[in-house]
């Protein structure tokens, strides 16, 4: 198996390096990742300038672009043979609920799926970085399952792992995305010259986080595996919108 591995924390991030080492025990691994932290880059592509890629001494490739750039460049411009799968992570910090809309980790996996490949995004529910090995083991277990039963078409697995030793993980649950309240307000400050600057506020608190959600699974000590897709169409609303558009007198 040939795996393309990327992330949004940067090519030197310990989560990526831990996962690369684990994956190399079962597969041929090609690392193509951003040259720096690109958290929150979502699905953005670099269009206004060329991308530069540099191969490091260990064979990994760093790119001065976004996670989506990295996967797109690797598959369509760098790799001589197409990978069998794209994996993104291990991200430092969870990507659950509405967070997936902003996540560069999820976006890298999504780009792989968009280019026709099975894809997994994996994150750990902490920024401390003590238990990346638990997340790596969860990915290896998923790969074994995928060897017996491939993913349904157009499916990305968004995996979130509790920040626990593997011996304390309770199991694995299939989940849906939870939801948060809206984000906290922007934080206003001033630069050294007194000019206003703004920091993005913290994510909103959990709102829909009951049983069945990714939030609940991880909080309960389970690995959360959420199937997501590229197609954002809300099919159950098409007829409603069609009727709304046919209304000749909106008033």
UniProtKB/Swiss-Prot annotation:
<comment type="function">
    <text>Nucleotidase that shows phosphatase activity on nucleoside 5'-monophosphates.</text>
</comment>
<keyword id="KW-0378">Hydrolase</keyword>
<dbReference type="GO" id="GO:0005737">
    <property type="term" value="C:cytoplasm"/>
</dbReference>
<feature type="binding site">
    <location>
        <position position="91"/>
    </location>
    <ligand>
        <name>a divalent metal cation</name>
    </ligand>
</feature>
<dbReference type="GO" id="GO:0004309">
    <property type="term" value="F:exopolyphosphatase activity"/>
</dbReference>
<comment type="similarity">
    <text>Belongs to the SurE nucleotidase family.</text>
</comment>
<feature type="binding site">
    <location>
        <position position="39"/>
    </location>
    <ligand>
        <name>a divalent metal cation</name>
    </ligand>
</feature>
<feature type="binding site">
    <location>
        <position position="8"/>
    </location>
    <ligand>
        <name>a divalent metal cation</name>
    </ligand>
</feature>
<protein>
    <recommendedName>
        <fullName>5'-nucleotidase SurE</fullName>
        <ecNumber>3.1.3.5</ecNumber>
    </recommendedName>
</protein>
<dbReference type="Pfam" id="PF01975">
    <property type="entry name" value="SurE"/>
</dbReference>
<feature type="binding site">
    <location>
        <position position="9"/>
    </location>
    <ligand>
        <name>a divalent metal cation</name>
    </ligand>
</feature>
<dbReference type="GO" id="GO:0000166">
    <property type="term" value="F:nucleotide binding"/>
</dbReference>
<keyword id="KW-0479">Metal-binding</keyword>
<keyword id="KW-0963">Cytoplasm</keyword>
<dbReference type="InterPro" id="IPR036523">
    <property type="entry name" value="SurE-like_sf"/>
</dbReference>
<dbReference type="GO" id="GO:0046872">
    <property type="term" value="F:metal ion binding"/>
</dbReference>
<keyword id="KW-0547">Nucleotide-binding</keyword>
<dbReference type="GO" id="GO:0008254">
    <property type="term" value="F:3'-nucleotidase activity"/>
</dbReference>
<dbReference type="InterPro" id="IPR002828">
    <property type="entry name" value="SurE-like_Pase/nucleotidase"/>
</dbReference>
<dbReference type="GO" id="GO:0008253">
    <property type="term" value="F:5'-nucleotidase activity"/>
</dbReference>
<dbReference type="InterPro" id="IPR030048">
    <property type="entry name" value="SurE"/>
</dbReference>
């Amino acid at each position: 198996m040939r795996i393309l591995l990327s992330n949004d924390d940067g090519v030197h991030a310990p989560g990526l390096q831990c996962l690369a080492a684990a994956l190399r025990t079962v597969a041929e691994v090609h690392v193509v990742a951003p040259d720096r932290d690109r958290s929150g880059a979502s699905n953005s592509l670099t269009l206004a300038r060329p991308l530069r890629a540099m191969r490091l001494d260990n064979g990994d490739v760093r790119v001065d672009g976004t996670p989506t750039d990295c996967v797109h460049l690797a598959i369509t411009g760098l790799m001589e043979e197409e990978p069998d799968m794209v994996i993104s992570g291990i991200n430092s910090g969870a990507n659950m609920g509405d967070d997936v809309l902003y996540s560069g980790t999820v976006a890298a996996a999504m780009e792989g799926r968009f280019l026709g490949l099975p894809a997994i995004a994996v994150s750990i529910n902490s920024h401390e970085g003590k238990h990346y090995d638990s997340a790596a083991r969860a990915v290896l277990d998923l790969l074994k399952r995928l060897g017996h039963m491939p993913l349904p078409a157009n499916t990305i697995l968004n995996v979130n792992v509790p920040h626990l030793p593997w011996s304390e993980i309770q199991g694995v649950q299939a989940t849906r995305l939870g939801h948060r309240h809206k984000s906290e307000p922007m934080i206003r400050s001033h630069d050294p010259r007194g000019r206003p600057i703004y920091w993005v506020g913290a994510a909103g608190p959990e709102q829909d986080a009951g049983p069945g959600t990714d939030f609940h699974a991880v909080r309960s000590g389970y690995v959360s595996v959420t199937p997501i897709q590229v197609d954002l169409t809300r099919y159950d609303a098409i007829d409603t919108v069609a009727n709304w558009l046919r209304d000749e007198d909106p008033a």
